[in-house]
């Protein structure tokens, strides 16, 4: 930073010279992570540096950030049966951990709209990685240290849920802020890493348990904890661009909620989350029946197949997105999702049902990241609050979709196929909302909807 006598010669890692000829009134400023990031961004912009090259490291760190989120969401559920036998914890209490994890993430989604802009993205993403690492480390230590093993697991889940919730809110806008010609492609590729992370956690953990034994799960927990630790350290150095440039006026929360498009995107996001999870949770059952494998293997293969297909969908758009119209892609994906639901609901063949599960995973891939990109393009100055509430809407859909499908199935004699058929209301609502917003944009602005 610069001192009053201009003796400091370095800003953001660059040598500075020529201050003797500059007429600058010395002043004392308070530097925070947020102001320092903005200073670095504006200084590099003044130098005319290549922003694409400079921000590759930032984007890579964000990709790994989504792998961290996949770790905290998917590793511990693999240990539920182990917790039940090792610590004599009732299964009813163990399944409560899922509700705690995603419930706290919902709270973080909402709360982050009010504090992230105040502390800045760098500090926020560092805190997210810290809590994720602490949660994974503590789950290997606290259950044996505390008299009540469940409380040790409970505290650990609370810790990594804070990290997971923050990561979901901050990583996407950090990538969105990076100067890039095709931000929708990058956003889709970013979200594909959650899918690869999910598949990787399941496959690597399964291999570890089979080679070294399930009793050594604590060692693996510490290995997974190294990922947020190492990636968190990279966020100390990578450049972070401001989501809203200084010359732009960001929308206040009151101004944001007055935007009709904002509410449309919230509905789309909620439907995207519901469409993704309504079938995802039943993937294991269809895989077990179609392939004639055990439940334990099916519980691993089903979610992996779904995640891999979803990741492939996002990676394809991430690679060829500049040749694909996002609006048409999302409408097509919604229609494909409806078709996959019908395959699962009406087919008497387990193989066709399995194909329907795979098609469902592929179809929902673009919906979540596509909504992020479209909202950012359409609502200028939406900022952190917009991303936070979009994440909240998506998580509400993820929780509500399977619940709705399960309730309908229960009312019809535990007929899961009919529950999934009823869940077609989510992709259908998504399609209708997309079309209405497209027509609305054309009539107001005489421009194409993406």
Can you describe what each PLM-predicted range is?
Residues 76-77, 260-304, 308:
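Extracytoplasmic gate region of multi-pass secondary transporters
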Residues 185-203, 388-401:
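Glycine-rich segments within core transmembrane alpha-helices of 12-TM secondary carriers
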Residues 108-121, 313-325, 409:
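Helix-to-loop junctions at the C-terminal end of transmembrane segments
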Residues 130-147, 336-348:
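C-terminal ends and interior cores of transmembrane alpha-helices
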Residues 96-114, 304-316:
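Central cavity-lining transmembrane alpha-helices of secondary-active solute carriers
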Residues 189-240:
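Helix-loop-helix hairpin linking two adjacent transmembrane segments in secondary transporters
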Residues 166-179, 366-379:
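Intracellular juxtamembrane helix-capping segments at the cytosolic ends
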